[in-house]
C-alpha cells in the first residue's frame, strides 16, 4: 500500500531531471491524498519510462504538462508534451510505453495514450485545451499525452 504522495515524489524528481536538460514543466497536483494498491518499483519505472520519452522526443520550447486528480476511487495522472518536428517520423518499437501499459495492468490500473498531429482536425482526439496550445511553435509536430489511472483503496 502506498500513499499518492509517493507518485507526487516520483513526478517531482522526474520534472527536476528534465528541467536540468532544458525543459520547463507545468505541474498541478491537488493536495488531496489517497492510498494506492501499487508497487513502488513499478511506479518508479513507469514515470522513468514516460519522462525518458520526453527527453528523447519532446520539444523543449513547450512546457511539459502534468495534472492529477482523485475521483471515483481512482487516482488519475496525465502527462502531456509537444513532439519535436525532427522526431515526428522516427520509428519506434514503443517498448517503453508497452512496458508502462503492462505495469499499469499488473497493478489493476489503466493507461490511455493519445497523439495528435498538427494536421489533425480539432476535436477529433482526447486532448485537453492546455495541450492544444503546444502547436504555437513551428518546431512542434504534435502533442503526446499519457493518462494513467491508479485504483485507490
Residue ranges of model-derived segments:
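Short conserved segments within the C-terminal catalytic ATPase subdomain
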Residues: 17-27
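Conserved micro-motifs of the catalytic ATP-binding
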Residues: 35-38
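A residue-level detector for a conserved hydrophobic packing site
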Residues: 43-44
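Short beta-strand/loop element within the Bergerat-fold HATPase_c
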Residues: 61-73
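Glycine-rich/acidic phosphate-handling loop/turn and adjacent ATP-lid/helix
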Residues: 78-95
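Detector for a conserved hydrophobic position within an alpha-helical segment of the HATPase_c
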Residues: 104-105
Amino acid at each position: 500500500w502506498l500513499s499518492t504522495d509517493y507518485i507526487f515524489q516520483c513526478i517531482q524528481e522526474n520534472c527536476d531531471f528534465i528541467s536540468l536538460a532544458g525543459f520547463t514543466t507545468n505541474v498541478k497536483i491537488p493536495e488531496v491524498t489517497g492510498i494506492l494498491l501499487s508497487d513502488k518499483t513499478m511506479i518508479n519505472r513507469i514515470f522513468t519510462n514516460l519522462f525518458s520519452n520526453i527527453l528523447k522526443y519532446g520539444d523543449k520550447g513547450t512546457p511539459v504538462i502534468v495534472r492529477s486528480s482523485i475521483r471515483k476511487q481512482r487516482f488519475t495522472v496525465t502527462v502531456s508534451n509537444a513532439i519535436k518536428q525532427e522526431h515526428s517520423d522516427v520509428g519506434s518499437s514503443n517498448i517503453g510505453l508497452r512496458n508502462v501499459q503492462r505495469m499499469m495492468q499488473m497493478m489493476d490500473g489503466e493507461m490511455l495514450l493519445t497523439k495528435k498531429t498538427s494536421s489533425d482536425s480539432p476535436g477529433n482526439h482526447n486532448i485537453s485545451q492546455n495541450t492544444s496550445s503546444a502547436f504555437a511553435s513551428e518546431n512542434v509536430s504534435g502533442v503526446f499525452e499519457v493518462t494513467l489511472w491508479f485504483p485507490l483503496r
